[in-house]
């Protein structure tokens, strides 16, 4: 019986990125953390729902903290050191996600709020009666 030929594959070399942008989308129901390079190419991402939190626990500051830690640790493979943070949305996980990225070991250079503000656009949802 013939021996199977060994195929040599080149190991994919990860590019090194020093500066990046952390996009934190904090809605009322979930928090999405995406870390990109300066051009906007995604390096890593994590969500509160994908981090094991379901239902109402998904919309907690602790879930946002865990999601930010997971995204930050995954992006460290690229040699990332400095982050600009762009926060979007009114969710409860805004500050805790930024704090978690700082605790992972990134130097946060500036924090920007990029929440879209309508010039009297769509009608907002009605107020909750609890």
From Swiss-Prot:
SUPFAM superfamilies: Translational machinery components (SSF53137)
Keywords: Ribonucleoprotein, Ribosomal protein, RNA-binding, rRNA-binding
Gene Ontology MF annotations: rRNA binding; structural constituent of ribosome
Top-level taxon of the source organism: Bacteria
Signal peptide: none
One Gene Ontology term, aspect cellular component: ribonucleoprotein complex
Record flagged with keyword rRNA-binding: yes
Subunit architecture: Part of the 30S ribosomal subunit. Interacts with proteins S7 and S18. Binds to IF-3.
The family this protein is said to belong to: Belongs to the universal ribosomal protein uS11 family.
Protein name (database record): Small ribosomal subunit protein uS11
């Amino acid at each position: 019986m013939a021996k199977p030929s060994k195929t040599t594959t080149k190991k994919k070399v990860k590019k090194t990125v020093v500066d990046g942008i952390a996009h934190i989308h904090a809605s009322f129901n979930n928090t999405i953390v995406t870390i990109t390079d300066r051009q906007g190419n995604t390096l890593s991402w994590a969500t509160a729902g994908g981090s094991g939190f379901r239902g109402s626990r998904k919309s907690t500051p602790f879930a946002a903290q865990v999601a930010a830690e997971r995204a930050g640790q995954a992006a460290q493979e690229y040699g990332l050191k400095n982050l600009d943070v762009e926060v979007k949305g009114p969710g409860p996980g805004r500050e805790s996600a930024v704090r978690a990225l700082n605790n992972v070991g990134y130097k946060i250079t500036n924090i920007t709020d990029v929440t879209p503000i309508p010039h009297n656009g769509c009608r907002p949802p009605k107020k909750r009666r609890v």
